[in-house]
Amino acid sequence: MIDSTRYPRLSRIQTPDDLRTFEEADLTAVADELRAYLIESVGKSGGHFAAGLGVIELTVALHYLYQTPVDQLVWDVGHQTYPHKILTGRRDQIHTVKQKDGVAPFPKREESVYDTFGVGHSSTSISAALGMAIAAQRNGDDRKVVAVIGDGAMTAGMVYEALNHAGGMDPEPNLLVILNDNRMSISEAVGGLTKMLGRASGSRTLNAIREGGKKILGDKKNNPTARFVRRWEEHWKGMFVPSTLFEEMGFHYTGPIDGHDLPSLVGALKTLKTLKGPQLLHVITTKGKGYELAEGDQIGYHAVGPFDPSKGLVAKAGAKKPTYTDVFSDWVCDMAAADPKMLVITPAMREGSGLVRFSKEYPQRYFDVAIAEQHAVTLAAGMATQGAKPVVAIYSTFLQRGYDQLVHDVAVQKLDVLFAIDRGGVVGPDGATHAGNLDLSFLRCVPHMVVMAPADEAECRQMLTTGLRYEGPAAVRYPRGTGPGTALDAALTTLPIGKAQLRHSGARIALLGFGATVDAAEAVGRELGLTVVNMRFVKPLDKAMLLELAKCHEAFVSIEDNVVAGGAGSGVSELLNAEGVLMPMLHLGLPDSFQHHASREDLLAEAGIDQAGIRAAVLKRWPQLMAKGQQALNAAAG
């Protein structure tokens, strides 16, 4: 429970209705308590941190002035929504964020009526809010709809599709877009738009003149004086402020204003509430505001584990196993030294994808395209047509956003593009929006693709080299976190395409493990005396080995950290069917549902693809193996 002596105002707020009982003069004190409580809470639980600190005042102002949940707030991405959750009935549970059965890390409609739209990926808020505004208008509802979007998310093309639609509608939608401009996404925001917005923060005088003129002249299009002023402004506006872009798209632009000045925020929002049609409010904020260490290291404090706020983040001592991301990070630098044709592309995920070192050592071969997955993939395709060897470093969940480009621009033309796909399979605490549960299914159906899934760190390095040297599109899909700890070979060696690895020779049943499931499968196979295969390739499958195993085994069990539907196991069944081989098969994988947020270990166990789950599934199907398993357990215990 919250300490009412430390938080005398916040302790009285369970919902925004409680917030609205305060006088406007008290809001700054409420914001100060909310910021302190967020620092204390995330220090205990971990979670997304700096983004929430940057929108404390904005969150308070919005819930104070708008009649939420009747008026609807749509938060882009959701990294910044912990303060929103605290003010909307989840204050005393916020310490459970990201934990199994705890508060969701992103807005989730099933969790609260105040979470009006589920998010996790960026740049969706304006489209969603516009849809809500249109539906409300058609229903005769006089509700306000507000989309809050960061400048990093504004780099995605979907944003401009929504702005273009909203600004050209008749009747005009009752929509407010708030641009939360902190010059950051997860990493530093990049690109021409970011530079343009950056100029705005130094143009307050000109903006004041513009806004004053609007009040005097009004915005009536037929006012001759106003038309003259607008023509004069056309000559100068591009030099100073970003209003041109938004106003030419049909939005009334206000700002920029200080997003940490509550009186200014409240005043601006009061005015905007009275206006009709699409509005855009530009606020300048600081990511990590109010916690000095986070302000100084906005990337490092974007998402944190539990820590002591009085000390800040402390590096863990001692050697640790490299993560798969670390393996990729080292490989990409080693390969760049060996192959001058290699170029690397990332859609705004330099830190997460392990490209910090590469970006510093090879800046002319590193391309951060901002949050633009579609562009990233087609950019790689264009590079490949000129003999370059592009690598697209991307999270599995974000590759979904560039799927048409993967098919249409890369695979159809059989171009040499390597997709280094991080966070494949079960991801964990970030929940369904960040899971990589679908990638093997949507990759293996694409003609010309080679799809690989490493069982360990050494194999990951080999597969990356194999994919880069393959003539055609290739994908290496690896999980979040660490592997089994296999020693790495500095050599840049390749694997034969489509060849599996026999891990253990047994009898009766063959366990076919793909990727991160191989270690657990091998442990079960050795215990029960079964054959175990590290399949390595999801496409092409090792046809020769599968047909040979089919001659001397009674059944196959496919095991993958991907949905069963259309996955690697389905490919095995299709191959056997095409060859006229009748073989009983048990497919183990992820369920036909979106998994909730929990630890990776919890989710693997729930899906039955950890060691205990594989063992239980095999024995349930073939109970006659129980005696063998019991003998092994007795031997281990004795």
From Swiss-Prot:
Binds 1 Mg(2+) ion per subunit. Binds 1 thiamine pyrophosphate per subunit. GO terms for cellular component: cytosol. Its cofactor is Mg(2+); thiamine diphosphate. Keywords: Isoprene biosynthesis, Magnesium, Metal-binding, Thiamine biosynthesis, Thiamine pyrophosphate, Transferase. One of its GO terms (molecular function) is magnesium ion binding. Its EC number is 2.2.1.7. Thiamine diphosphate binds at residues 79, 120-122, 152-153, 182, 291, 373. Mg(2+) binds at residues 151, 182. InterPro entries: Dxylulose-5-P_synthase, THDP-binding, Transketo_C/PFOR_II, Transketolase-like_Pyr-bd, Transketolase_BS, Transketolase_C, Transketolase_CS. The keyword Iron does not apply. GO terms for biological process: 1-deoxy-D-xylulose 5-phosphate biosynthetic process; isopentenyl diphosphate biosynthetic process, methylerythritol 4-phosphate pathway; terpenoid biosynthetic process; thiamine biosynthetic process. The keyword Iron does not apply. Pathway: Metabolic intermediate biosynthesis; 1-deoxy-D-xylulose 5-phosphate biosynthesis; 1-deoxy-D-xylulose 5-phosphate from D-glyceraldehyde 3-phosphate and pyruvate: step 1/1. It catalyses: D-glyceraldehyde 3-phosphate + pyruvate + H(+) = 1-deoxy-D-xylulose 5-phosphate + CO2. Catalyzes the acyloin condensation reaction between C atoms 2 and 3 of pyruvate and glyceraldehyde 3-phosphate to yield 1-deoxy-D-xylulose-5-phosphate (DXP). Homodimer. Belongs to the transketolase family. DXPS subfamily. This is 1-deoxy-D-xylulose-5-phosphate synthase. It comes from Xanthomonas campestris pv. campestris (strain ATCC 33913 / DSM 3586 / NCPPB 528 / LMG 568 / P 25).
